Each structure stands twice: as C-alpha cells, then as structure tokens.
Amino acid sequence: MKSNDLFRASGIMALGTIISRITGFIRGILIVAVLGTTLLADTYNVANTMPNILYNLLVGGALTAIFIPQLVRSFEHDDGGDDFASRLITTISLILLVLVTLGMVFAPALVRLYAPEFFTTGFETEQEIAIAFTRYCLPQIFFLGLFTMLGQVANARGSFGPLMWAPIANNLVGIALFGGFLAFSPNVDISSITSTQVQILGWGTTFSVVVQALVLVPVVKRLGITIKPKLGLRGLGKSFNLAGWTLVYVLISQLGYLVTVNVATSAAVRSAQEGIKTGVGYTPYTYAYFVMLLPYSIVTISIITAILPHISKLALDGKRDEVKAQLVRAIRLVGVITVPSAVAFLFFGPLITQSIFIGIPTEDSRYIGYVLSALSFGLVAFSINLILIRGFNAFEDTKTQVVSIFVINIIAVAMSYFFLYFLKNQWVTVGLGVAFSVSYLVGLFVTLGLLKKHVGKLAISEFLAQHIRLLSASLLAMLPLYALTKYISWVAPDMTRAGRAGELLLVMVIAFFGYLLTAKAVGVEEISMVRHLGSSITRRSAKTSENE
C-alpha cells in the first residue's frame, strides 16, 4: 500500500470514527453532567470499565490480534472459511457466557480488587453502588465478544467500515439514556441516588452494547458468510496456541491498568477524607484519556485496521522489507496527526476540557485538562508502539512483544505507586498521566529493538527526522497561541464557559491552518495526505447511503 492508498482505505473508517467520537463526546458530556467527576462517577466508571477489562484480559486481545491472520488463511479452505468462523464464534461465545456468570457472582471481589478503598469505613454507600453497577454492566462481556467477532469476520473479508460505524449506535443509545436521565433526575449525588436509578443507568449502559453488537449481524449475512452454531475445536488449535502469548500480553496490560484504577480511586477516597470537593480520581483520568485517544482513534486505528491484513499477507509471502516499509509509512502518516495533537493537548488541555465538560464545576473540568496535558507526552509513542505491535502480529509472533509490554508496565506501575505516596492526593491522578507517558516513551525503544528479528534493523532515524519537523511546525504554530491564551486568562480570569469555548474555537482554527503552513514550510511531505484523507472522507460521506 502506498501512502495515498492507506489514507483512501482509511477514509471510510476515519469518517465512522469521527462521527463515533463526536457522539461519544456528547455521551461523555452527559455522563459527566449526570454523575459529575467525584466518587459517584468513580463507582459507575469502575463498574463500566470492568466488562472491558475482563473481556480484554481473557478473550479480546486474542481475537483482535490473532484471529484476523487466521481468518485470512481460512479463506483458502474449500468452504471459504465458514467452518472456522462458526467454530470460533461458538466456542468463544460459550466461554464468554461462563465468564459473565462467574463475574456476576463474584462482583464484590472484583470491586475490592480494583477499588479497595471503597471498602474503607465511612464509604459503605460507594461500595454498595459500585457492586450494583458492576453486576448490571458485566453482561456487556458477551456482547463485546460478539461485536468483536462479527466485526473481525467482516474486516477479514475486506469490509472495514461497519466495525467503525457500529459504536455510533452504542453512543446514540447512551445519549438517549443519560439525556433522559438528566432531564428527569438532574441533581443526583452519592447520597441521593436510588437503587432504581442505579438499575436504569447500569442496565441501560449494557443495552447500548447489545445494540452495538446486533447491528453487525445483517452486515455479516450480506457478505455471504454462513455462521452456524458448531461445537468443536478442530481448526482452532493453532489459534489458541498463538492466543496463549497474547493472553500473557493482555494480562500484563490489565494488571498495569488494575494499578491505575487502584491508585486513582485511592487518591479520590483519600482526597474526600481530606475534605477536597474537586473530582481528582479515576473519572478525571478516564475522560482525559478519552480525549487524548481521539486522534489515535481517528487515524491510527483506521490505518492499522487497513494495513494489518495486507502486511499479514506480505509476511506470509516472505516480503520482510515490504512489511518494514509499510510500518514506517504508517508511522510517518500517523505522526502528521498525533504530533500536533500532542502539542495541542499539552498547551491547551485545561481550555479544551473546560469547553467540553460544561455540566460540572470549572475546577472539575480544569482538572481533567491537567491530566490530559500529562498524558499528551505519551500520545505519539503510544501510537507508534501500537503500529509496531501489529508488525509482530503479522509474523504471528505473540511471544516477543510480551517483553515490550512488560517493560512499559513495570515503569508505569513503579511511577504510579511513587506518585501515590509522594504527591499530594489531589495531584496523584495527574501523576498517573505522567507515568503513562514516560512508560510508552521508554517502551518505544524496546519495541523497536525487538522487531529487528523480523524486519531487520528498524531505526528510529527512519521517522525521527520527520517527527522533529512535525514537532517544529506544531510549536511554531501553537506557541504564540499558547501565550495568547495565557494573556486572555490573565486579563479575563472569570470568563464564562461560552467565552472559553469561543476562545478554544478561535485557537484551534488558527492552529490548524498555521500547522499546515509551517509543516509545508519545514518540508513535511506527508502533510498533503491530510487533504487526501479529507477528500476520501467527504466522498465516502456522500456515498454512505448507497453503499452502506
């Protein structure tokens, strides 16, 4: 795939992801408006994260990383891969049903594992609500698995768009749920929320995931794929062998995330004990991370999804140099978006979150921005690392990449606990953002070194010079604007939310066009790809009703 081809192939996915993220923003704003960012919100977010954690830990990583290459190979079978897909979906579905049942039984233990300080004396209400939310949200595990399996089957047949568009249905249900809740129950807090309201929010959130999965059923049927319930492991042995190392990889990742949730909720409880009213726990981290992932979600995931089946075939054909070239090309293209985004988050984090999260006190929304600025340092390295990991997957090497994620998580865990015990409680979650960034910056060099066994030496110099030019262009465009925002804050410290939103809009428009000009001036060739991506998205938007 050439650079233009990559951007054109990712156009439909980028369009779907953009709309998904817009609706996701609206949903997130409504959730924050309903629950705030303090301990009530933490009980919901910990519980709603639990299905994703357990799913990714036991099944999800293996599905996304391993079974696409296996599905591609199964298409060469006489039945076109229908038997493999049927056995895979049946087997994984049964595993997920067992997992849901066990999770609901042991929900209190799960909450104690991830948020142990909810069990502190005086926080019994938080404990009860968190356990209830967890039980209502855990059935999502089954439908997350169904969504992923159907989506990956479609991806392997070359239909990339539906997997990116289905989350929009999820978000629309969430918007209706939290919008309606806000209209009828606008002032709930940890002491006033009722068990019925907890059920509505918990089961409603799960229903949104059900809808997300079911919209893919007609897509798979339209592709001519026949999936029938079929027990048996024949044909899945190699996949489960490969998945073993992927599960180790995911286990390490989720243990690291366990520490993040643990430390953030601990900071929230301790801050509450000190009388701090601002939300400083897991919820601010969740929404800062959500904003930080926006450019990654729009561009990096789209390009990775488009490139993975292609590089898997190149690896199968023994074209290692071409695999390397595709990875470098993807890194350079992704950098065009992620580098300026990281600089923008660093400079304008609090301004961005103040403008987005309008249903909460200013101090709460500003704190999310501080966490966003801390996370910004790691955005570029995080995106590059994910691309390189797909290189290992193309060669079906799930063992070596475990070393990389182990190093990343050791650094993040060590720094997280350091911050928990040596920072003031209200700044611990900002420290978690720093820990994320540092761990991925170091991990990038580890991953580059490990990938050498498959594609030869892949030196950072192959994209470093371009990234330095991107950084220079971003700084030239945004430093003056950063100084301007500081001046505005000095002369108008009490500006309204609407005023801050207008300020952000002006800054972002000027920064965007300034970046395009400065990037072109410093010789970034890939900057022209932004125009091609925009054209691809626009064309696809016009044709969506016909082709989708």
Question: Could you describe each region identified by the protein language model?
Answer:
Residues M1-E548:
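Membrane-embedded alpha-helical bundles of multi-pass transporters/translocases
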